[in-house]
Amino acid sequence: MDKDTQATLHHRRLGRVDGMTAGGRLEDMVRLFRSLAQSKRPEYFIMIGGTSYGPEKIENLASELSIED
């Protein structure tokens, strides 16, 4: 996995089907996630190849791949 890996950002909504917010490079999706208000971040996750990554894992990936704000 690298910064150019294709990923999608999804919004989790109670009582509704999760909706895809955006798709593109992992680096761009992490930056979009980080631009969200801190209180909203728990509602979002990133999908890569059928695997979902929550807020904590997204931050770990950002550190591992040296993705800055």
Across the structure, where does each feature detected by a protein language model lie?
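Short aromatic-glycine-(Arg/Gly/Cys) micro-motifs in beta-strand/loop hairpins
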Residues: 1-17
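A short, exposed loop/beta-hairpin motif centered on an aromatic-Gly-Thr core
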Residues: 17-24
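Generic structural motif
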Residues: 12-14, 26, 51
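Compositionally biased, intrinsically disordered low-complexity segments
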Residues: 20, 33, 49-51
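Short, mixed-charge low-complexity intrinsically disordered segments
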Residues: 39-69
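A short, charged, amphipathic alpha-helix used as a generic interaction element across diverse proteins
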Residues: 24-39
